[in-house]
Regions:
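Positively charged n-region of N-terminal signal peptides that target proteins for export
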Residues: 1-4
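Sec/Tat signal peptide C-region and signal peptidase I cleavage site
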Residues: 17-21
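Long compositionally biased, domain-poor regions of proteins
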Residues: 22-31, 61-131, 136, 143-144, ...
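Activation corresponds to long, low-complexity, non-globular regions
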Residues: 25-53, 222-290, 429-430, 478-480, ...
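Signal peptide-directed secreted proteins
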Residues: 176-266, 317, 440, 445-459, ...
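Acidic, proline-/serine-/threonine-rich low-complexity intrinsically disordered repeat tracts
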Residues: 432-488, 492
Length: 524
């Protein structure tokens, strides 16, 4: 355990949480595993390479192999034949090797066409019906990293925050994009283009689909620059060359031992994760992992990642991102009064905060349902909904989301009393104030100048004027008569003794004033 560093703000001590409690909301509390499960619906994931540098095959489930642009060596396909319910997830970015296609200056950016091909290897036509799905590119759904942060209500027309979020909300609501066909037939021994989309240099494209076939078929995802027809797309598949950008080919051993995750190019088993948990809130707050990983499972040891049925050699070993997977979690709660449903992402140790999630979440209670859009940075805990629990009965709360691409899995879902969230906010404000205070540059310490001498008012000393010498009058002059007493008062007489005492007091005052002045100059 790392040592604690304690910050003092006023009379409040602020200490960072221990390493294992990296979501502040659950400090001193424990998470419990959901113990849910994935279904077995096969889903083709085309996400490796994420950044595509030119034309070629991205992933194919047909038998055989294709030549890697980086090594010139053949790589085995992710062979798989679909039959029945299936899914598709495509997510790629275009960064061309040909710099002239980047559109520097006023030049037009080049475009890459992504296409999904359906192949029927059999002697009978295969009919496919699509239930839900959408395809979006950067033109249709611009990606702005810090747009729409926080929690916002989601109306009939969803927020537009990037291709990954735009397709996920369509899947969450069970809608099929009007640009896609709801039914399609693949003739025997034939292949067709399911969809294609164009993305500009530095652009992103994402597709999510769920369907069901009445027979066996295979799929491939290809990239082409400036194709003129479907035949040009089929030609990419026939040439048998992989698109450049497979940066993990030099790290295959690290993928195998789990030190590098890579991304997914293969078929995952499972398009839905379902779980149910019961909890008495009188015994404490509820914390459960959602989209947990090996690294972020909050002490439960539960990893909510589904397996792959087939994969390219440079693909991750499992569906590590769970992109496109629907999570349905039902919480049966007992308790009373106001509580908060909170969605969190752990603090990023050793790195700056980043956008960890931008997507849509549905919350269902006995009072109905609401959809919200969530934009979250790492280390944040955001309240999704206020819950008013009825005492003495079960209070079911269901949370659903389709995990969007460009998010970082490993979240925590919590139900806590209102005051627990309020206390967290207070601590965050104090910590923010302490951090802001630390950023204020300290001024160079200087020795304060000595204070000026204390001004001492010295009373002036009036010296007695010498008595003039009196010449005695001649004897023949008669002395003047005595002055008469005015109203019974005798003439004033200053005795020599009294005058000497007054003068002494004035001398003493002068000495004391001088002493005070000397003391002040010596800094006493």
């Amino acid at each position: 355990m790392r040592p604690f560093a304690i910050a003092l703000l006023g009379s409040v001590l602020i200490a960072p949480l221990p390493a294992e409690a990296y979501v502040a909301l659950m400090a001193g509390q424990q998470a419990k595993p959901l113990q849910g499960s994935f279904n077995n619906v096969p889903v083709l994931h085309s996400n490796q390479p994420e950044e595509v540098h030119g034309p070629g095959i991205l992933v194919s489930t047909t038998p055989g192999s294709a030549i890697a642009a980086e090594t010139g060596e053949p790589l085995a396909n992710a062979g798989y034949t679909f039959n029945g319910a299936f899914g598709l997830h495509v997510h790629h970015k275009y960064y061309p090797n040909d710099r002239s296609r980047m559109g520097s200056g006023r030049g037009r950016r080049g475009e890459l066409t992504l296409a999904t091909l359906l192949i029927n290897p059999g002697s009978r036509p295969v009919h496919i019906r699509f239930e839900r799905g959408a395809v979006r590119n950067s033109f249709e759904a611009p990606y702005l990293a810090n747009n729409l942060m926080g929690v916002k209500p989601l109306g009939v027309r969803p927020w537009n925050t990037g291709p990954g979020d735009a397709t996920a909300v369509q899947m969450l609501r069970g809608q099929l994009d009007r640009k896609l066909q709801d039914e399609i037939t693949i003739p025997a021994y034939s292949r067709i283009v399911l969809f294609s989309t164009q993305l500009p240099a530095k652009g992103i494209a994402n597709g999510l689909l769920k369907g069901k076939s009445d027979g066996p078929f295979q799929m491939a995802v290809v990239a082409a620059e400036d194709p003129q027809s479907d035949a040009d797309l089929f030609s990419v598949l026939d040439q048998g060359r992989l698109a450049p950008g497979r940066i993990y080919l030099s790290r295959l051993r690290q993928i195998e031992n789990g030190t590098v995750f890579s991304r997914v190019a293969g078929v995952a088993l499972g398009d839905t994760y379902e779980a149910s948990v019961s909890h008495d809130l009188e015994q404490g707050a509820l914390h459960v992992p959602l989209t947990s990983t090996n690294r972020h499972n909050f002490g439960t040891g539960e990893v909510q990642v589904n397996a792959l049925a087939s994969r390219m050699v440079d693909s991750s070993l499992n569906n590590v991102g769970t992109y496109g997977v629907r999570f349905d979690v039902t919480m049966n709660l007992r308790g009373a009064g106001p509580h908060q449903l909170v969605f969190s992402h752990p603090t990023a140790n050793g790195r700056s905060r980043f956008t960890a999630f931008r997507g849509s979440i549905r919350i269902e209670t006995v009072d109905g349902y609401e959809d919200v859009h969530v934009g979250m940075k790492s280390g944040e805990s955001l309240p999704l909904s206020s819950l008013n629990l009825r005492p003495g009965q079960n209070n079911p709360v269901k949370v659903s989301l389709v995990y969007p691409a460009d998010a970082t899995p490993g979240h925590l879902l919590s139900v806590v009393p209102d005051q627990q969230l309020a206390e967290l906010r207070r601590r965050e404000e104090l910590l923010a104030a302490a951090q802001a205070a630390k950023k204020i540059p300290s001024k160079t310490a200087t020795v304060a100048p000595a204070p000026p001498p204390v001004a001492v008012e010295i009373e002036p000393i009036t010296m007695a004027r010498p008595m003039p010498q009196v010449t005695p009058p001649p004897q023949w002059i008669q002395p003047p008569p005595a002055l008469p007493t005015i109203q019974g008062m005798t003439p004033a007489v200053i005795s020599p003794t009294r005058m000497s005492q007054s003068l002494l007091e004035r001398y003493q005052q002068a000495v004391q004033a001088q002493q005070k002045l000397m003391d002040s100059l010596m800094g006493r």
